[in-house]
Each structure stands twice: as C-alpha cells, then as structure tokens.
C-alpha cells in the first residue's frame, strides 16, 4: 500500500480475513474502522470510499480475481485496522431440492443475465420484483430475504461489462445497468 497523504491510502492488496488475522495475533488491540460496500461495489477494481470514522480510502485492486469480501482486512498498522463490511441487501433465495432443479434454476436465471451467488445449498440473487414474479410463475418457490451477497458464480457475473450471445432471447423490455436492478425505461 502506498500512502499519498496521511488520510488517503491507496489499497492495492487484501491482507486476509479479520477473524484469521486476529487468531494469528496480527490484530490485537488496534481499533477497527469499517468500509461499508454494497455487494456490486465489491467487484470494482478502482474505488474510493470513506470509513465509518470519515477516513478516505482509495482502492486499486488490479490483480486478477481480487474481489473484496466481508471482513477482508485491507490495512493493518500498530494504530489502526481497516476492514470491509459488505452491507446486507434484499435478495431472492432459491432452495433447489435436486441437482436438475438447481441446474434449471441457474440456467434460467443466467439467461436473464442476473448475477448468481451461492450460499450453502441455496442460490441467491439481488432482489428484483419482475425476476421474483417470474421465478414464482416458473415454479421455483423463491423467498425474499436480507443477506450479504458473496461467492458470485463467475461464469454468470456480467457486472460492469457488455456482452453478446450467438443467440437471441427476449427480456420482455427489462434490463439492468450492471447493478442487478432490472427495470424498463
């Protein structure tokens, strides 16, 4: 990490998980400042945020596969620890009972270009009313909940970039701008 001024470090690496670093004795009595992120911000390579105490922090995470997760530690000193807090958000939860049902759910949701997340045996995705209603109509028995989204399935996560297919399908006028919030203009 380079410090360009005393209040604006540029974070270039994730140092580890808060619990693991505490268990290793690398974090003891230092105060812990939190940087609150929405789930979709955790995948950005370049980001500027403020900790819960008002300290500005800039991120430049350029290594392939670097994604911020809840309780990631991004700064440690004798005086301070800065850790990530992924904020809970409204989600759709699916609990497929069989592997074919899981495959069908993931395939259908993938065709609608919504990011998918694994949470144990459940599939979660950002809440969107048209998607929720479609999943109900398709017989998937979705539930609405509030959770932290993590462990995105990378093959489906089309966040932040455009893409195309060799086939076409109808999104019935709905689309999103890389944030998972489906809507019509």
Swiss-Prot record:
Residues 153-185 are annotated as: Disordered. GO terms for molecular function: nickel cation binding; unfolded protein binding. NCBIfam families: PRK13261.1-6 (NF009754). This is Urease accessory protein UreE. Pfam families: UreE_C (PF05194), UreE_N (PF02814). It is found in: Cytoplasm. InterPro entries: UreE, UreE_C_dom, UreE_N, UreE_N_sf. GO terms for cellular component: cytoplasm. The keyword Chaperone applies. The gene is ureE. Its main location: cytoplasm. Keywords: Chaperone, Cytoplasm, Nickel, Nickel insertion. Residues 162-175 have a biased composition (Basic residues). One of its GO terms (biological process) is urea metabolic process. Gene3D superfamilies: Urease metallochaperone UreE, N-terminal domain (2.60.260.20), UreE, C-terminal domain (3.30.70.790). Belongs to the UreE family. The keyword RNA-binding does not apply. Involved in urease metallocenter assembly. Binds nickel. Probably functions as a nickel donor during metallocenter assembly. It comes from the Bacteria. Residues 176-185 have a biased composition (Basic and acidic residues).
